[in-house]
């Protein structure tokens, strides 16, 4: 069964993560924002989700979540699978 945003991804973000990133225009709990297919200079498609993932893994800095426990390998794999599965709702 594909990984879904509502069931598998959104619950991984703590309320403090959502509030913190909202100040920077990053809507972690908004499926439309996270699944937007638009690319940028770094990623050819789905830049919003791909930048979030890069910050979760530490490939982009500052690493997320700020001031909190970093995601486990299992949680990161789930997010990566969500992207691989096609950003399912």
Please give the residue ranges for each predicted region.
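Aromatic- and Gly/Pro-enriched helix-to-coil junctions and flexible linker segments
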Residues: 1-89
